């Protein structure tokens, strides 16, 4: 009775340790980000963000002015230094947001670097001699033998043997995967370990070009480039900043004409409040955090452009097998023929499957047991198993008493029964056609010269796929299923799964044709694949998600790689892309809406003394002109760190149409962006008013 308690206590301690380590790591990331926020004050770094660079220049100007005698009697000596400090913290907060996002990526890179240990490889020379060399000395096309318990030294493809490989260092999945020569599962990754048997691989990458090297480079941000959307938005924001800069610089000309002067510090404060500093300070963090969210989802995006493109996808091309369906045909029901009973069909179907280790064979046993149909297992185990062959298209067992039991393709079993001198029941082909039209695969069960019935094998649609496709439909995304099945079977699966369109008897070149046809309509297309024959289509698609278990050609052609090798993850990737675009759009809306309240705070404060009628614009009833300016600046600075969690996590995303999303975001972040600063500035003014 005590052992389960002990196990639970151990599990609790493990969880507590993991939580403690996560908190420690978060503290380390925050500390590093705080240091980096100061280091990023370097003008060479700041100029990459023109908006915050203008704020930094404003800090320098007001800081210098604080040590010079003031020519304005209305501006006290402490005002300039206060403004300069607020501007400094505004820049520091923006730098902190970017450094925090980068820090999370670097933490992931550090964990990946731990998997790059000093590894030695057994290289096979041309003369057959085996030489041990360091993994760093390996070059492309070198042939290496990797034995049980050894680390795979670099990326490669299996050319001989079969082995179980532990890829947990890369994918986080503890269950080993089978790698073998030929086919779509020959690709191996450096840093993974062979846990059984032995394989010979040919190296496919030079030092510094391996999969792990690329991952480290990407998550560290070294390879990160601004996306087209990010560049376009940055250009718009920079243009706004330039326009407001011209307005502020020329403003003294008009105020002199009106007979009064505006202090330089007030002009700087006006400029900072006018320009979109909120989104300017968070823009880089949003992009980096978007990449980070994809990486945490165990998907490696080759660029931020790929993540953004996922958010704009209009069409998704999906393989049926393994994506929409489980890929394993399972026994769905039994159909007796002639005067036979379902118990007789089940009995002989089970006997033919006892020694059959295929998923189909096991599913027959499970079905018969679930239906409580009795059969003699020992009788089958004592017989001689006849495995499935492409030539015969049948499998079964020859019993010790000479009885021959077979199950297999309709035509093959019918031909075999006729060769035994048997007759064919009239309803065999009729029931076989019925199964095919239902989207299933018929297997005929026969004993010697007598057919007993059919096994209805069905490739089951994964649970929840219809609901997920409905969500995509609400988002305006069309789903297209590609399958090698005949049109009848394809139509049945498509209807059951709820996809919009399907392509039956599809060949690899047909996928490219489908992608090009959609792109010719102005659509952005995403697809998944794992084989060499998928590589051209993955390269053609706007978003190509390759499986990590697939071939090197597929992974090189794609712009995203799923480390878990789960094709359905393309749906989640699209959601992350949309969340990234929505977060950027929502915070841009919020930032620009903020300016409305800041105008009502700072503009009356600047002009009330010269133009008393401007007091009518002081709808917030702020304490004094100086208090109004400082309150607007303080809110402008404080809102950046308050929005960092939202920028990092992304705004809540729900599948809906583009128009519905636009209306929702305008209501929440547009109207909210107007209301929040009115409240925030008023509260800050009440506090500041106590001290001035």
UniProtKB/Swiss-Prot annotation:
Pfam families in alphabetical order: E1-E2_ATPase, Hydrolase
Tree of life domain: Bacteria
EC number in record: 7.2.2.6
Gene3D superfamilies: Calcium-transporting ATPase, cytoplasmic domain N (3.40.1110.10), Calcium-transporting ATPase, cytoplasmic transduction domain A (2.70.150.10), HAD superfamily/HAD-like (3.40.50.1000)
Record localization: Cell membrane
InterPro entries, A to Z: ATPase_P-typ_cyto_dom_N, ATPase_P-typ_P_site, ATPase_P-typ_TM_dom_sf, ATPase_P-typ_transduc_dom_A_sf, HAD-like_sf, HAD_sf, P-type_ATPase_bsu_IA, P_typ_ATPase
Membrane-related topology note: Multi-pass membrane protein
Official protein name in the record: Potassium-transporting ATPase ATP-binding subunit
Species the sequence originates in: Bacillus thuringiensis (strain Al Hakam)
Source organism phylogeny: Bacteria, Bacillati, Bacillota, Bacilli, Bacillales
Gene: kdpB
């Amino acid at each position: 009775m005590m052992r389960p308690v002990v196990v639970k206590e151990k599990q609790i301690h493990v969880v507590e340790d993991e939580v403690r380590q996560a908190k420690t790591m978060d503290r380390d990331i925050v500390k590093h980000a705080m240091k980096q926020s100061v280091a990023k004050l370097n003008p060479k770094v700041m100029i990459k963000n023109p908006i915050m660079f203008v704020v930094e220049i404003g800090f320098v100007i007001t800081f210098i002015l604080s040590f010079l005698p003031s020519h304005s009697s209305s501006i006290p000596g402490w005002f300039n230094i206060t403004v300069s400090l607020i501007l400094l913290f505004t820049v520091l907060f923006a730098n902190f947001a970017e450094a925090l996002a980068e820090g999370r990526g670097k933490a992931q890179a550090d964990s990946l670097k731990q998997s790059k240990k000093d590894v030695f490889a057994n290289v096979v020379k041309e003369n057959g001699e085996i030489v041990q060399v360091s993994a760093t000395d390996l070059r492309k096309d070198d042939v290496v033998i990797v034995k049980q318990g050894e680390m795979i030294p670099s990326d490669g493809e299996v050319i001989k043997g079969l082995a179980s490989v532990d890829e947990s260092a890369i994918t986080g999945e503890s269950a080993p995967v089978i790698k073998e020569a030929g086919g779509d599962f020959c690709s191996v990754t450096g840093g993974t370990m062979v846990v059984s048997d032995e394989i010979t691989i040919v190296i496919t990458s030079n030092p510094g070009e391996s999969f792990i090297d690329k991952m480290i480079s990407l998550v560290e941000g070294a390879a990160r480039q601004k996306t087209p959307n990010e560049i376009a938005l940055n250009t718009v924001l920079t243009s706004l900043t330039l326009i407001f800069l011209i307005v502020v610089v020329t403003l003294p000309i008009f105020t002199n004409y009106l007979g009064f002067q505006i202090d330089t510090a007030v002009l700087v404060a006006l400029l900072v409040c006018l320009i979109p500093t909120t989104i300017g300070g968070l823009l880089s963090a949003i992009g980096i955090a978007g990449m980070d969210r994809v990486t945490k989802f165990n998907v490696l995006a080759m660029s931020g452009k790929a993540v953004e493109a996922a958010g704009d996808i209009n069409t998704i091309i999906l393989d049926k097998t393994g994506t929409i369906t489980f890929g394993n045909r399972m026994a769905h029901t039994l159909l007796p023929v002639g005067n036979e009973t379902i118990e007789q069909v089940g009995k002989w179907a089970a006997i033919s499957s006892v020694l059959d280790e295929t998923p189909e064979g096991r599913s027959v046993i499970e079905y018969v047991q679930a239906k409580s149909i009795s059969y003699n297992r020992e009788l089958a185990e004592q017989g001689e198993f006849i495995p499935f062959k492409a030539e015969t298209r049948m499998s079964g067992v020859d019993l010790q008493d000479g009885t021959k039991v077979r199950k297999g393709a309709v035509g093959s079993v019918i031909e075999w029964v006729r060769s035994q001198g048997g007759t064919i029941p009239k309803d065999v082909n009729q029931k076989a056609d019925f199964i095919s039209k239902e989207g299933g695969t018929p297997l005929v069960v026969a004993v010697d010269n007598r057919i007993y019935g059919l096994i209805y094998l069905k490739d089951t649609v994964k649970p929840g796929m219809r609901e997920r496709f409905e969500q995509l439909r609400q988002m305006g995304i069309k789903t297209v299923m590609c399958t090698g099945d005949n049109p009848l079977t394809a139509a049945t699966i498509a209807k059951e799964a709820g996809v919009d369109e399907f392509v039956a008897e599809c060949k690899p070149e047909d996928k490219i044709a489908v992608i090009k046809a959609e792109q010719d309509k102005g659509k952005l297309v995403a697809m998944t694949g794992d084989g060499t024959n998928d590589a051209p289509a993955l390269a053609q698609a706007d978003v190509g998600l390759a499986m990590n278990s697939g071939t090197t050609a597929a992974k090189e052609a794609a712009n995203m790689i799923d480390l878990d090798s789960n094709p359905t993850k393309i749906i989640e990737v699209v959601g992350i892309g949309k969340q990234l675009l929505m977060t950027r759009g929502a915070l841009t809306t919020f930032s620009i809406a903020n300016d409305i309240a800041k105008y009502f705070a700072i503009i009356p404060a600047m002009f009330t003394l010269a133009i008393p009628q401007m007091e009518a614009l002081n709808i917030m009833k702020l304490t004094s002109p100086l208090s109004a300016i400082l309150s607007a600046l303080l809110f402008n600075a404080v809102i950046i760190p308050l929005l960092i969690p939202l920028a990092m996590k992304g705004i809540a995303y729900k599948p809906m149409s583009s128009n519905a999303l636009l209306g929702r975001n305008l209501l929440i972040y547009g109207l909210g962006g107007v209301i929040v600063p009115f409240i925030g500035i008023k509260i800050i003014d009440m506090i500041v008013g106590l001290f001035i």
